[in-house]
C-alpha cells in the first residue's frame, strides 16, 4: 500500500480532532466516504441510525463545511464529503511541500488524481504480478497502479515510451522497451486485466475521469481548493512537458 492523496483521507484527522463535531457525525462522515450513499435514507439504513438523527448530524457537518448536498429532482439528497476551506488551505500548503519530493513526477501526479477520482480504496503501486512475466527474460512486468479487485491497471507513458530519448543507450534498447509494453498489454488482456495508458496530456482531473474504465466506480468530487491545486499541478506538468519537448531533458515516467 502507498500514501494516499485523497482529500477525505487527508482531512479525516482534522475532523476527528474537531470538538465541534459529534461522535455520531464523525462516524457518519467515515461511512459516507466508504459507501457513497445515494440518499439520506440510504445512509440511515446503512448506519442503523434513524433518518431524523442522520439528517440532523449531516446538516451539522454541512454547516461546518464537511459535506455538500445536491438535491435532485427526485428529491434525493446526494451527499458529497469534503473539507472546510481552512482545512483545505492547510492541506494545500502541505501538498505543495511534499510534491517536490515526487519522482517520477508524471506518474505521481497520475496516482494522486486517481486517488481523488476512483472510488476503490485498495490498490497496489509499482507491483509485479506473478502471472505477468516477460517470456524472453523471465522477469515480471510492472504496473504503475493496479486495482486488483477490479482488474484494471494504469500505466503512465512518459515520452520515453513513445520515442527514443537520452534514457535509451541504443535503438535496440528503445525497441526492447516498446516490446515489453506490448507484451504487458497482451498478457494483461489474456488475464482479463484492462490496461489504461495515461500520457502527460491526460493529467487534468476532467481528462483522467474520461480515461477511467466503466468497471471502476467513480468518486464524488467536491472541486474545492485541494482538488483545484492538484489539477493545477497537472497543468503545470503539461506545460513543462510542452516547453521541454525536443530538448535533451531526461523525462520522467512509468517503469516498464
Positions of the model-derived regions?
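Short recognition helix of helix-turn-helix/winged-helix DNA-binding domains
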Residues: 1-42
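Short, cationic-aromatic polyanion-contact patches
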Residues: 19, 39, 71-93
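A short alpha-helical element within helix-turn-helix/winged-helix DNA-binding domains
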Residues: 35-50, 61
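Short, hydrophobic-biased segments on the C-terminal half of alpha helices
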Residues: 55-59
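A short, conserved structural fragment
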Residues: 62-72
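Short Asp/Glu-rich motifs
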Residues: 63, 80, 206-208
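Nucleic-acid endo/exonuclease domains
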Residues: 87-256
Amino acid at each position: 500500500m502507498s500514501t494516499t492523496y485523497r482529500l477525505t483521507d487527508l482531512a479525516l484527522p482534522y475532523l476527528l480532532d474537531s470538538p465541534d463535531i459529534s461522535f455520531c457525525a464523525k462516524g457518519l462522515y467515515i461511512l459516507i466516504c466508504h459507501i457513497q450513499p445515494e440518499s439520506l435514507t440510504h445512509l440511515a439504513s446503512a448506519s442503523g441510525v434513524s433518518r431524523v438523527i442522520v439528517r440532523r448530524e449531516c446538516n451539522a457537518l454541512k454547516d461546518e463545511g464537511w459535506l455538500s448536498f445536491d438535491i435532485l429532482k427526485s428529491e434525493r439528497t446526494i451527499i458529497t464529503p469534503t473539507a472546510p476551506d481552512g482545512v483545505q488551505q492547510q492541506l494545500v500548503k502541505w501538498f505543495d511541500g511534499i510534491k517536490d519530493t515526487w519522482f517520477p513526477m508524471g506518474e505521481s501526479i497520475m496516482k494522486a488524481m486517481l486517488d481523488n477520482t476512483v472510488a476503490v480504496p485498495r490498490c497496489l503501486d509499482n507491483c509485479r504480478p506473478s502471472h505477468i512475466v516477460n517470456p524472453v527474460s523471465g522477469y515480471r512486468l510492472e504496473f504503475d497502479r493496479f486495482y486488483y479487485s477490479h482488474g484494471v491497471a494504469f500505466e503512465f507513458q512518459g515520452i520515453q515510451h513513445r520515442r527514443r530519448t537520452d534514457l535509451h543507450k541504443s535503438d535496440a534498447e528503445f525497441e526492447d522497451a516498446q516490446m515489453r509494453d506490448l507484451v504487458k498489454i497482451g498478457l494483461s488482456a489474456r488475464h482479463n486485466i484492462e490496461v489504461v495508458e495515461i500520457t502527460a496530456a491526460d493529467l487534468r482531473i476532467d481528462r483522467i475521469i474520461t480515461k477511467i474504465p466503466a468497471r471502476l466506480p467513480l468518486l464524488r468530487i467536491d472541486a474545492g481548493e485541494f482538488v483545484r491545486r492538484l489539477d493545477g499541478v497537472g497543468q503545470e506538468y503539461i506545460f513543462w512537458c510542452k516547453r521541454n519537448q525536443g530538448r535533451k531533458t531526461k523525462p520522467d515516467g512509468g517503469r516498464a
